[in-house]
Structures are given as structure tokens and as C-alpha cells.
């Protein structure tokens, strides 16, 4: 029986051909994601640099019990919050207007989560600064060698994970995440030393509590670095993996 449907060739209807042409034309006029991806990635990196600077500034305020420096860190946290809001809006716009799929979509979803983690790191840095501000009336904590070491290590891990993100380097991301154990070890040493100091003299209870809070916030920054490493693994492999079991 001969079909009443017009044909453009064996097994291919005119409707099929028209659908193919329409799909190809849409693909041709669709703006490339490359430019949007670069813009987003660059903005994420700038946000990451802000976070690293905040961690180091909070450290200086903590070491020197500098109330004014602490206040600057607390106030500057709004810059990180604004950056996260801008980036989240930009990513949502790109997803809505360009409808990315597969790896492009994973890239955007991963970066959206990275901005959230960076914003929380900024909050933790501001919390360290708040503890430093409360310590302003006490002598600088000379014995706490581990605390500056812990802060510098967390800042270095932030820098390292941003490098892994730039290169979309799964191996580098895993190596950075593995160093979170070093942060945890420093935290436990600070915890034990501080408790010993607090038991020895009740006058040390208040400053000791501030030190413990500051160390806790730094430890949380290390955990969030691991979360970003998991985002990079997801971006590369499409698999969700727990790097801090």
C-alpha cells in the first residue's frame, strides 16, 4: 500500500526532515556556552581569592587581638555574600536561557554549589574575626603555634582547590581533600592544649573558649574545601563521591 504521507526519501518523511532542520537551526543560533562558562569561572575564582584574603586577615586579627582588623573582616563579608548572590543569579540565567545538557549542565551545577561553599567559608572567616574581636582585651596567645599554622593551612587548601577547579583536575582535587586530615589533627591538638590551659586557671576559660571557637570555624573551612573537591570529581566523572567518609 502506498502511504498518503509525502516522503523525502526511503524511510524519511518530510516531517522528519523538517524536524531535523529545525533542531539544527536552533543549535546554530544558540549562543555558545564557552563565553558564559569563562565569565562564571573567572567570577568564582575572584570570589575564592576574596575568601582566602578573609581567612588570612582573620588570622592576623586573631594573632594580634586587633579589634579594628577584626571589624574590617566582619564588614567585608558582605562582599562575598554579594558575589555569591550575583553568581547564583548568573548561573540560573544561563541554565534557563541556554538549556545546557550533559557536561555543560554538570559544570554549571557544580560551580553553583562551589559558590555556596565559598560563601559559607566567608561566614566562617567572619566568625573567626568575631572571636578575635572578643579576645582583644586579653594578651595575644603566644603558646598557640598550631592556630596560625591551622589558619595558613586552610588558606592554602582554599588556594589549592581553586587551582584544581581552574584546571578541572580531579587528581589535584583529591590530593587537596586528603590534606583536610592535617587540619583535623591541628584542631585536636589545639583542643587538648586549650582544655589543659582552661583547667589550670579559671581566668583562661573565656579566652580559651574563644580560641576553641576560632579553631572550630577553621576546621569547618577545611571540610568545605573537601566539599568543593567532591564538586570537581562530579564535574569530571558525573559521579557523586564522599571524599570525607
Label the predicted regions:
Residues 1-245:
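Cytosolic, long alpha-helical scaffolding segments
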Amino acid at each position: 500500500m502506498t502511504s498518503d504521507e509525502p516522503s523525502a526519501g526511503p524511510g524519511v518523511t518530510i516531517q522528519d526532515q523538517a524536524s531535523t532542520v529545525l533542531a539544527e537551526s536552533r543549535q546554530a543560533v544558540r549562543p555558545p556556552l564557552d563565553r558564559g562558562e569563562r565569565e562564571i569561572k573567572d567570577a568564582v575564582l575572584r570570589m575564592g581569592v576574596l575568601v582566602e584574603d578573609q581567612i588570612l586577615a582573620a588570622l592576623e586579627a586573631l594573632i594580634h587581638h586587633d579589634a579594628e582588623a577584626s571589624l574590617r573582616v566582619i564588614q567585608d563579608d558582605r562582599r562575598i555574600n554579594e558575589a555569591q548572590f550575583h553568581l547564583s543569579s548568573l548561573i540560573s540565567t544561563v541554565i534557563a536561557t541556554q538549556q545546557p545538557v550533559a557536561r555543560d549542565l554538570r559544570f554549571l551545577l557544580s560551580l553553583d554549589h562551589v559558590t555556596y561553599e565559598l560563601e559559607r567559608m566567608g561566614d566562617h572567616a567572619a566568625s573567626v574575626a568575631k572571636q578575635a574581636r572578643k579576645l582583644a582585651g586579653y594578651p595575644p596567645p603566644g603558646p598557640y603555634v598550631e592556630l596560625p599554622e591551622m589558619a595558613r593551612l586552610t588558606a592554602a587548601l582554599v588556594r589549592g582547590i581553586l587551582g584544581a577547579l581552574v584546571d578541572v583536575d580531579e587528581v589535584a582535587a583529591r590530593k587537596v581533600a586528603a590534606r583536610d586530615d592535617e587540619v583535623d589533627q591541628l584542631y585536636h591538638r589545639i583542643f587538648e592544649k586549650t582544655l589543659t590551659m582552661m583547667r589550670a586557671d579559671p581566668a583562661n576559660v573565656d579566652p580559651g573558649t574563644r580560641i576553641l571557637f576560632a579553631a572550630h570555624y577553621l576546621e569547618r573551612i577545611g571540610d568545605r574545601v573537601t566539599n568543593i573537591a567532591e564538586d570537581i570529581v562530579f564535574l569530571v566523572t558525573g559521579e557523586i563521591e564522599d571524599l570525607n567518609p
